[in-house]
C-alpha cells in the first residue's frame, strides 16, 4: 500500500482509495492520482503494443555485423483473441422475467450495440487487466453507454469495507494549452478540471450514482498474458537467433587445403566455380588435397527443443488452450478435450462472476435514469447467462433437451442449451405455432363439418325429389 498526499492510497493492482469522509477529491490529490495513472499507462500501452505485434526485440540496437533478423511470435494477439472469443463469442443473455420490461431492456441493448461494447470491454480487460464502462445522456437526453481504457481513465474507491466508487476520472491533454484536462464524475455532480484548477461550477448527475463501473477478470487486475511476457520475449529472441544462424550458414565456406590454384602467380587462388561443377589442378600433389564445405555446428535439435518448450509453457502458464495442438485435431473423446480446456474454462468462470457483478452495477445506473424500464430496482432481478463458445454437437444438444423435457421447465431446459439464444422468445414462438396449429385444426374441422352438412342436405334434397316423383307416378296410375 502506498500513501498519496496523506488522504489517498494506492493498493496492489493499481487500486486508488480515498477517504469516504471527504465530499470530493482535493485538487492536489486528483493530480497525484492522475500522474500515477499516467505512469501505470506505460505498462498498459506496452501490453497493447505486444498485442499489436510491436515487441521489444524490434526496438533493440542493431548488430554491427552478421545477419540481424527480428522475428515476432505474436502469441499475445492469439491468446487474447482466442480467450475473448471463448468468453464473449456467444453474447451473454441478459433478461428480465417481466415480458414488457424485458422487451424494453432488449431494445436498449440493441440500440446501444451493448453486446459489441461488452466484447470490447472484455478484450481490454484481457489486454490491460481492467476496463471501464460509463453511462451518459446524449444530446437527445437518451441514456447511452461508452467504454474507456485505463490508459486515460481511472476509478477511485472509498476507504470503507464495501469499497464503493467515490469518483470516476477521465482525462486528456488539451492540444492548445498543453495542460491535462478532464472530468471527475461523483455520485451527485460532475466537475471539470484543467491542470491544477478545478472549475467551481458543477454539472448535475441525474443518476445519483458514480456513472461508471470497472470491469476486471481477477482481483489482481492482471491481463491474460501478463504472466508470460518474459517467455514471449525469449521466444522472439530464440526464433530470431535461429533465423540468423540459418542465414549465416547459407553463405557456406569452401575449405581447400593442399591444392595450388594460383595459375597467374599473383598469390591468389584462381577458382572460377560459377557454372562449373569441378575443381581441376594439374599438380600431382592434388591427389592428397582436402576440398570440402565447412559444416555448421548441429544445434538445430536443441533450438527446436527450447522453442517447443517455450511455446508449451506460454500456453500452460497463460491457461489459454492452443487450439492448433494435435490434441484438438485427432479423434480424442469429448471428455479428453474437456480436460484440455479445463484451465481456460475455470479462468472464464471466474471472469464470468466478476463480469456479472459489474453488469448488475452498470444496469443499476442505467435503470436509475427512469428511461429504460419503469422499475428502477429491476437491476436486482436481472438474469445473466454466459455461454462459453465451444463447438456445438447438435445431436447431443437435441438429446439433452429431450431428456430434460418434463423434468424441468421449458425455460430452464432452453437456458441450458446452446441451440437457443433467447429462451423466452423461443417459448413465445412455440406457443404461437401451437395456437396456429389449433386454429388451423379448428378451421379444417369447421370446413369438414360444413361439407358434411352440405352433403347431408344434398342427400335429403335427392330423397325429397325422389319421393315427389314417386308420388306423381302413383297419381298417374290412379
Regions found by a protein language model. Give the residues of each.
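Short secondary-structure junctions and interdomain/linker hinges
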Residues: 41, 55, 86, 90, ...
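Extended, helix-rich architectural segments
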Residues: 1-144, 470-478
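C-terminal helix-loop subdomains that flank or include functional centers
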Residues: 270, 277-284, 302, 309-478
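Extended, regular secondary-structure scaffolds
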Residues: 122, 126, 132-221
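Conserved aromatic-histidine-acidic binding/catalytic patches
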Residues: 53, 67, 71, 88, ...
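Short amphipathic alpha-helical segments
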Residues: 100-101, 109-117, 125, 227, ...
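Extended, charged amphipathic alpha-helical segments
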Residues: 201-336
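A short, surface-exposed helix-loop junction/capping segment
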Residues: 102-105, 290-292, 341
Amino acid at each position: 500500500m502506498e500513501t498519496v498526499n496523506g488522504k489517498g492510497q494506492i493498493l496492489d493492482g493499481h487500486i486508488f482509495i480515498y477517504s469516504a469522509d471527504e465530499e470530493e477529491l482535493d485538487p492536489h490529490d486528483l493530480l497525484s492520482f492522475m500522474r500515477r495513472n499516467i505512469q501505470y499507462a506505460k505498462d498498459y500501452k506496452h501490453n497493447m503494443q505486444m498485442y499489436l505485434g510491436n515487441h521489444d526485440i524490434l526496438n533493440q540496437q542493431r548488430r554491427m555485423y552478421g545477419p540481424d533478423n527480428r522475428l515476432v511470435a505474436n502469441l499475445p494477439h492469439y491468446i487474447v483473441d482466442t480467450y475473448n472469443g471463448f468468453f464473449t463469442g456467444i453474447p451473454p443473455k441478459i433478461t428480465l422475467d417481466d415480458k414488457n420490461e424485458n422487451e424494453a431492456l432488449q431494445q436498449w441493448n440493441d440500440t446501444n450495440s451493448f453486446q459489441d461494447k461488452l466484447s470490447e470491454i472484455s478484450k481490454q480487460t484481457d489486454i490491460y487487466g481492467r476496463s471501464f464502462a460509463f453511462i451518459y445522456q446524449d444530446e437527445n437526453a437518451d441514456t447511452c453507454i461508452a467504454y474507456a481504457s485505463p490508459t486515460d481513465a481511472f476509478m477511485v474507491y472509498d476507504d470503507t469495507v464495501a469499497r464503493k466508487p467515490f469518483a470516476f476520472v477521465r482525462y486528456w491533454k488539451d492540444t492548445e494549452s498543453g495542460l491535462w484536462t478532464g472530468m471527475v464524475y461523483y455520485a451527485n455532480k460532475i466537475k471539470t478540471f484543467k491542470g491544477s484548477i478545478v472549475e467551481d461550477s458543477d454539472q448535475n448527475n441525474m443518476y445519483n450514482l458514480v456513472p461508471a463501473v470497472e470491469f476486471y477478470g481477477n482481483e489482481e487486475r492482471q491481463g491474460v498474458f501478463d504472466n508470460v511476457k518474459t517467455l514471449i520475449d525469449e521466444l522472439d529472441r530464440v526464433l530470431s537467433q535461429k533465423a540468423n544462424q540459418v542465414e549465416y550458414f547459407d553463405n557456406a565456406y569452401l575449405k581447400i587445403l593442399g591444392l595450388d590454384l594460383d595459375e597467374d602467380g599473383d598469390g591468389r587462388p584462381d577458382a572460377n566455380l560459377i557454372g562449373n561443377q569441378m575443381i581441376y589442378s594439374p599438380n600431382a600433389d592434388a591427389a592428397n588435397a582436402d576440398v570440402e564445405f565447412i559444416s555448421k555446428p548441429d544445434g538445430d535439435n536443441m533450438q527446436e527443443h527450447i522453442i517447443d518448450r517455450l511455446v508449451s509453457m506460454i500456453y500452460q502458464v497463460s491457461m489459454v488452450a492452443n487450439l492448433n495442438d494435435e490434441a484438438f485435431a485427432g479423434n480424442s473423446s469429448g471428455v479428453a478435450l474437456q480436460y484440455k480446456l479445463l484451465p481456460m474454462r475455470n479462468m472464464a468462470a471466474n471472469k464470468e462472476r466478476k463480469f456479472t457483478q459489474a453488469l448488475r452495477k452498470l444496469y443499476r445506473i442505467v435503470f436509475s435514469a427512469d428511461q429504460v424500464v419503469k422499475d428502477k430496482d429491476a437491476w436486482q432481478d436481472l438474469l445473466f447467462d454466459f455461454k462459453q463458445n465451444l463447438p456445438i454437437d447438435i445431436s447431443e444438444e437435441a438429446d439433452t433437451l429431450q431428456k430434460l423435457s418434463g423434468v424441468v421447465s421449458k425455460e430452464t431446459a432452453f437456458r441450458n442449451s446452446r441451440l437457443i439464444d433467447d429462451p423466452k422468445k423461443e417459448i413465445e414462438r412455440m406457443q404461437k405455432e401451437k395456437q396456429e396449429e389449433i386454429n388451423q385444426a379448428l378451421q379444417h374441422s369447421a370446413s369438414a363439418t360444413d361439407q358434411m352438412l352440405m352433403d347431408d342436405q344434398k342427400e335429403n334434397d335427392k330423397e325429397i325429389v325422389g319421393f315427389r316423383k314417386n308420388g306423381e307416378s302413383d297419381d298417374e296410375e290412379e
